[in-house]
Amino acid sequence: MQRLMLKSKIHRATVTDADLHYEGSISIDEALMEAADLLPYEKVAIYDVNNGERFTTYVITGKRGSGVICLNGAAARKVAKGDLVIIASYVIVDGEEAKGWKPTCVFVDPENQIKH
């Protein structure tokens, strides 16, 4: 049996911008992408802590070290600048691997810099 498991998440990132007229996606600081093992065009779930919205989109690479978390296109209607979001990616694993599965969790400060 296979299971869909949380692969990684960026926990409580601050939305830095929302650009309605840009091609749909979420721009994420490249350093955060690497820490969360996210690739360009990878599907992610977005959970807005402030308003309860939950939706999916795909990742595009933002400037490294900028702290950018920008929702683009239609997704821009689901968030507001300053909202806290959880960005989650999932992976399918077999049942035995799932028993000991541990996702990668990236915690950030209010400027979306990785907490160590």
From Swiss-Prot:
Question: Which residues get modified to Pyruvic acid (Ser)?
Answer: S25
The cofactor remark states:
Binds 1 pyruvoyl group covalently per subunit.
Catalyzes what? L-aspartate + H(+) = beta-alanine + CO2
Its post-translational modification remark reads: Is synthesized initially as an inactive proenzyme, which is activated by self-cleavage at a specific serine bond to produce a beta-subunit with a hydroxyl group at its C-terminus and an alpha-subunit with a pyruvoyl group at its N-terminus.
Q: Which SUPFAM superfamilies does the entry link to?
A: ADC-like
Q: So what EC number does this one have?
A: 4.1.1.11
GO biological process terms, alphabetically, are:
alanine biosynthetic process; pantothenate biosynthetic process
UniProt cofactor(s): pyruvate
* Binding-site residues, substrate: T57, G73, A74, A75
Q: What domain of life does the native source organism fall in?
A: Bacteria
Recite the UniProt keywords alphabetically.
Answer: Autocatalytic cleavage, Cytoplasm, Decarboxylase, Lyase, Pantothenate biosynthesis, Pyruvate, Schiff base, Zymogen
State the Gene Ontology terms under molecular function: aspartate 1-decarboxylase activity
Subunit note: Heterooctamer of four alpha and four beta subunits.
According to its UniProt entry, what is the function of this protein?
A: Catalyzes the pyruvoyl-dependent decarboxylation of aspartate to produce beta-alanine.
Give the family from UniProt.
Belongs to the PanD family.
Protein name listed in UniProt: Aspartate 1-decarboxylase
Q: Which organism is it from?
A: Syntrophus aciditrophicus (strain SB)
